[in-house]
Regions:
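Active-site rim/adjacent substrate-binding subdomains
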Residues: 1-144, 149-168
Length: 168
């Protein structure tokens, strides 16, 4: 599965390390981001991926831009993948909603997780620029799911109900 680690790998349970600011634009970081994108796009249902999912304990996640273009109402960005380095959710709505989730590292299990309907995320992009981004709906759900990965939490830890589906 294109080097995507699975739920029993200890890297998924640790708190990922912060990427030093001076290393954000470094070749090593750029190569890691490229590996993440390749792994994410190797799966038809790949929506987003965090560095620990490819065995690297660093606070980075990527979201498939092509998915956002299709799935997020009024999405104004292009189809480039979005990169978030050292992300922190700085604000969450009190409104919560139970949402279905799956994960490339917990293959073929799905569940319902109670998530905030709106969040604000602070992070650095791959060029080292600090960004603050508000999100609702699917994008807010992805931000929360990926930040959980960076803190050693899998969606199955929070799910109210979990079921298995087969690859189709």
């Amino acid at each position: 599965m294109s080097n995507i680690v699975q739920k029993n790998d200890p890297v998924l349970r640790g708190k990922a390390k912060i990427v030093p600011i001076k290393e954000i634009g470094a070749m090593k970081t750029r190569e890691l981001i490229e590996k993440m994108k390749i792994a994410m796009h190797s799966q038809k249902d790949g929506v987003a991926i965090a560095a620990p999912q490819i065995g690297e304990s660093l606070q980075i996640f990527a979201i498939a831009g092509s998915l956002l273009k299709k799935a997020v109402k009024n999405y104004k960005g292009d189809e480039n993948d979005l990169i978030f380095i050292n992300p922190r959710i700085i604000k969450t709505s009190k409104d919560k909603k139970e949402m279905e989730e799956g994960c490339l590292s917990v293959r073929w299990l799905y569940g319902k997780v109670n998530r905030s309907t709106r969040v604000t995320l602070e992070a650095y992009n791959e060029k080292g620029k600090k960004i603050v981004r508000g999100a609702s709906g699917l994008l807010a759900q992805i931000f929360q799911h990926e930040c959980d990965h960076l803190n050693g939490v899998l969606f199955t830890d929070k799910a109210n109900e979990v079921w298995e589906m087969t690859a189709e």
